[in-house]
From Swiss-Prot:
It comes from Pseudescherichia vulneris. Belongs to the radical SAM superfamily. Biotin synthase family. One of its GO terms (molecular function) is 4 iron, 4 sulfur cluster binding. Binds 1 [4Fe-4S] cluster. The cluster is coordinated with 3 cysteines and an exchangeable S-adenosyl-L-methionine. Binds 1 [2Fe-2S] cluster. The cluster is coordinated with 3 cysteines and 1 arginine. PANTHER family: BIOTIN SYNTHASE, BIOTIN SYNTHASE, MITOCHONDRIAL. Residues 38-256 form the Radical SAM core domain. This is Biotin synthase. [2Fe-2S] cluster binds at residues 97, 128, 188, 260. It comes from the Bacteria. [4Fe-4S] cluster binds at residues 53, 57, 60. GO terms for biological process: biotin biosynthetic process. InterPro entries: Aldolase_TIM, BATS_dom, Biotin_synth/BioAB, Biotin_synthase, Elp3/MiaA/NifB-like_rSAM, rSAM. Keywords: 2Fe-2S, 4Fe-4S, Biotin biosynthesis, Iron, Iron-sulfur, Metal-binding, S-adenosyl-L-methionine, Transferase.
Length: 346
């Protein structure tokens, strides 16, 4: 379905109800119409300001409301961030994402954030940030600095959202996505599976994303990472097939978006990850940690790519000499290197 045709909840729930193999076949068919099925986009995520967040997101160890043992850190120095970006590039990432545990960035932080974006872009990497809600001026300033992507997840359906977060409204999240889009920055927005939501809620989340005026260019689908001290620490595990279904439905509904395996990949075995790629996932976060949760060791990713015959995707902002593509391909096929352990200095 073209993205200008609005989906209905009944259409989405019908997709979730399909026999799994039929759903995977449909998703993979659509995926191949828009993407090279062997290409996977590789991103690295760095927490540039950790913990002490005033929000009450029940899944998040960075909230100041929960005792999770997380060490809080102030905003990193610009050069520290750029050093991590260099390591990520050397390890083969094509996009560098910077995350700060804020409700929203303060004016005093904006010059440093702009310098980070400019420095990352100067390396030939795509730059992405996730900083909480933005106003129009902040979005414009980040766009002027060269920011490619802004991440702001919807997390779940509007109906279930109030069970998870009370300090920021669903509409505030949608408003931030509008401001980012209006500033000319690409949108990265997805959600989390395993919050205690129903299949109808998963359908509702994807409905919101797919029915945006322009669907997000990047859609991260996270599996809840249960962190001791957070209210969701004792939630039931997510069934792997339910997660794979969510990936497949996202691919069908948003055929031209990158669908990213994000948090929770540490909990997935190789077979589950392979089925996610079959379902249409074509982007991963690659590095030691995803903000404050574990990510599979990088050499395991290298080995999995090699087993599945997958290749890292070249970034759009490269200068033309293919140096970065060659670096990652060399390491994919010579996986005895330890450079990947330095992909994200968190």
């Amino acid at each position: 379905m073209a993205h200008h045709a609005r989906w209905t909840l009944s259409q989405v729930t019908e997709l979730f109800d399909k026999p799994l193999l039929d759903l995977l076949f449909e998703a993979q068919t659509i995926h191949r119409q828009h993407f090279d099925p062997r290409q996977v986009q590789v991103s690295t995520l760095l927490s540039i300001k950790t913990g002490a967040c005033p929000e009450d997101c029940k899944y998040c160890p960075q909230s100041s409301r929960y005792k999770t043992g997380l060490e809080t850190e102030r905003l990193m120095e610009v050069e520290q961030v750029l050093d991590s970006a260099r390591k990520a590039k050397n390890a083969g990432s094509t996009r560098f994402c910077m995350g700060a545990a804020w409700k929203n960035p303060h004016e005093r932080d904006m010059p440093y954030l702009e310098q980070m974006v400019q420095g990352v872009k100067a390396m030939g990497l795509e730059a992405c940030m996730t900083l909480g809600t933005l106003d129009e001026t902040q979005a414009q300033r980040l766009a002027s600095a060269g920011l490619d992507y802004y991440n702001h997840n919807l997390d779940t359906s509007p109906e279930f959202y109030g069970n998870i977060i009370t300090t920021r409204t669903y509409q505030e999240r949608l408003d931030t996505l509008d401001k980012v889009r209006d500033a000319g920055i690409k949108v990265c927005s997805g959600g989390i599976v395993g919050l205690g939501e129903t299949v109808k809620d998963r359908a509702g989340l994807l409905l919101q994303l797919a029915n945006l005026p322009t669907p997000p260019e990047s859609v991260p689908i996270n599996m809840l990472v249960k962190v001791k001290g957070t209210p969701l620490a004792d939630n039931d595990d997510v069934d792997a097939f339910d997660f794979i279904r969510t990936i497949a439905v996202a691919r069908i509904m948003m055929p031209t978006s990158f669908v990213r395996l994000s948090a929770g990949r540490e909990q997935m075995n190789e077979q589950t990850q392979a089925m996610c790629f079959m379902a249409g996932a074509n982007s991963i976060f690659y590095g030691c940690k995803l903000l404050t949760t574990p990510n599979p060791e990088e050499d395991k990713d290298v080995q999995l790519f090699r087993k599945l015959g997958l290749n890292p995707q070249q970034t759009d902002v490269m200068t033309g000499d293919n140096e970065q593509q060659q670096k990652l391909e060399e390491q994919i096929f010579n996986a005895d290197t330890d450079q990947f352990y330095n992909a994200a200095a968190l």
